[in-house]
A protein has these predicted regions:
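Alpha-helical transmembrane-bundle signature of multi-pass membrane transport and export proteins
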Residues: 1-416
Length: 416
C-alpha cells in the first residue's frame, strides 16, 4: 500500500496556529467563508439571469444562450486556469478574479437600474465572470492542501462539498425573492458577495503555494506537462475515468427525473420538492463524509460507494416518472460527497504543489464536460424511449465507474 506524500505546505499547516479542528484553522475558514458567500451570490444570479433575459427579450432561446455561453467559457478556461494557478501567486490571482467579478456584476446591476442591460452587456458580464470563476475555483482547489494538515484534507474537501449543496438550497429561492423585489438586486447582491470574498482572501496570512524554483515554461509546454502527469499517474487516470461518468450520471439522472415527473403530470411544486430532497441528501452526505472515511479503508470505501450508487440509481430508474424515485436517488446523492471527498483529497495529496492547478483543471474539465452533455443526453433519451429504459442509461454509467474502481491499480493502492 503506497502512502501519499506529505507536501511542505501541508506539513507547515500542521503547526503555527493550525492545530486542532478545521474550524480553528483561520486561513481555511476565511477561504471557505468567502467562497460560501460568493457561491451563494452565484446561485442567486443563476436563477435571476435567465429571468432577466427572458423579461428583456421575451425569448427562451436567448435565455438559454446566456447559460450555454457561461458554461462553455468556464470549460474553455479550465486548462489555462490550471497553468495560471501553478504559475502566479494564488492569493493575488484569486483577489484579481474577485475584483473582476465584483466590477462586472456591479456594472450589470447599474445597467439594469438604468435600463441599459442589453443582451451584449449581459453576455460580456457572463463571459468575464465565468472565466474569472474558472480561474478562482482552480486556484482555490490547488490552495487547500497548503492551508490544512494532511489528515484534514478529506474533511476540508467534504466541507467544500457541503458548501456547494447548501448554497444550491438557499441561493435560488433567495435569488427569486430579490428579483421579485427589484430586478437589479440579485446582481448587486452578487457584487457584494464578491467584495466579501475578496476581503476574506485578502486576510489570509499563510502561503497558498510552495516557492517556485524553476523558470516558468511557455503556456503550451506547461499545459502538456500537467496533462502528462495526470494521464501518467495510475490513481489520477482512475479519477478521470470515475469522475466523468459519475458527474454525467448524477446530472443526467436528476434532469431526466425532473422531466419524467413533469411528463407524468406531477405538479411543479412537487417536482421542486424532489429537487430540494436531492440537495438535502447531498448536504447531509457532505457532513457524514469524514465519519464514513474513518471507518473504511479508502480503496474499499470508493469501490463500495460506486457500487451502492449504481444500485440506488437503478432503483430510482425503475421508479422513473413517480415521486417515489426521489428516495433512492436522494440516497445516491447522499453518497456522492463521500466519494468526491475521498477522491479529491487523495488527488491533492499525491499531486506535487507546482502541478496542482493543472491537474485540478484537467480533472474539472473532464468532469464538467461530461456533466454539460448530460441534460442533452437525458432529453434525447426521453424523447425516444419511456422513462424507465431512458434513465437506466445513467446507472449503467455509474456501473462503468464502479468497475474501474474495482479493477484499477490506482484505486487499490490508495493510502488507507
Amino acid at each position: 500500500m503506497t502512502r501519499a506524500p506529505v507536501s511542505e505546505g501541508a506539513a507547515g499547516a500542521a503547526g503555527g496556529g493550525r492545530a486542532g479542528g478545521l474550524w480553528r484553522n483561520r486561513d481555511f475558514t476565511l477561504l471557505w467563508t468567502g467562497q460560501c458567500l460568493s457561491d451563494l451570490g452565484g446561485a442567486m444570479v443563476d436563477l435571476a439571469l435567465p429571468l432577466l433575459v427572458l423579461q428583456q427579450t421575451g425569448s427562451p432561446a436567448r435565455a438559454g444562450l446566456v447559460g450555454t455561453v457561461g458554461l462553455v467559457t468556464a470549460l474553455v478556461c479550465r486548462l489555462p486556469a490550471g497553468v495560471l494557478a501553478d504559475r502566479a501567486d494564488r492569493r493575488r490571482l484569486m483577489i484579481a478574479c474577485d475584483a473582476l467579478r465584483l466590477a462586472g456584476h456591479a456594472l450589470l446591476g447599474w445597467a439594469v437600474v438604468t435600463g441599459r442591460a442589453s443582451l451584449p452587456v449581459i453576455l460580456a458580464v457572463v463571459v468575464a465572470g465565468s472565466a474569472a470563476t474558472a480561474v478562482f475555483s482552480t486556484a482555490e482547489h490547488a490552495s487547500v492542501r497548503n492551508l490544512v494538515r494532511p489528515d484534514q484534507l478529506t474533511s476540508a474537501v467534504a466541507r467544500n462539498e457541503a458548501r456547494t449543496y447548501g448554497v444550491s438550497l438557499a441561493g435560488p429561492p433567495l435569488g427569486g425573492l430579490l428579483f421579485g423585489l427589484g430586478r437589479a438586486l440579485p446582481f448587486l447582491g452578487n457584487a457584494l458577495s464578491f467584495l466579501l470574498s475578496l476581503a476574506a482572501v485578502w486576510r489570509i496570512r499563510g502561503p497558498l503555494q510552495q516557492p517556485r524554483r524553476e523558470a516558468a515554461e511557455p503556456l503550451g509546454a506547461s499545459t502538456v506537462q500537467g496533462l502528462r502527469f495526470l494521464l501518467g499517474h495510475p490513481f489520477l487516470r482512475a479519477l478521470l475515468v470515475i469522475a466523468a461518468p459519475l458527474n454525467m450520471a448524477f446530472t443526467g439522472m436528476i434532469f431526466a427525473m425532473t422531466l419524467a415527473l413533469r411528463r407524468a403530470g406531477v405538479s411543479a411544486p412537487v417536482v421542486g420538492l424532489a429537487g430540494t430532497i436531492f440537495a438535502l441528501g447531498g448536504l447531509l452526505g457532505a457532513f457524514a463524509a469524514p465519519a464514513l472515511q474513518r471507518r473504511l479503508r479508502l480503496p474499499v470505501l470508493i469501490t463500495l460507494l460506486c457500487w451502492a450508487t449504481a444500485a440506488l440509481m437503478t432503483a430510482g430508474a425503475l421508479l422513473a416518472g413517480t415521486v417515489a424515485a426521489a428516495v433512492p436517488l436522494a440516497a445516491a446523492v447522499f453518497l456522492g460527497p463521500t466519494a468526491n471527498a475521498a477522491l479529491f483529497a487523495h488527488q491533492a495529496a499525491v499531486t506535487p504543489d507546482h502541478l496542482q492547478g493543472r491537474v485540478v483543471g484537467g480533472v474539472l474539465l473532464a468532469a464538467g464536460s461530461a456533466a454539460a452533455l448530460a441534460p442533452a443526453l437525458a432529453g434525447a433519451l426521453l424523447a425516444r424511449w419511456d422513462p424507465v429504459p431512458a434513465t437506466l442509461v445513467f446507472p449503467a454509467l455509474v456501473t462503468a465507474a464502479a468497475l474501474t474502481a474495482t479493477l484499477s491499480r490506482g484505486i487499490r493502492t490508495m493510502s488507507a
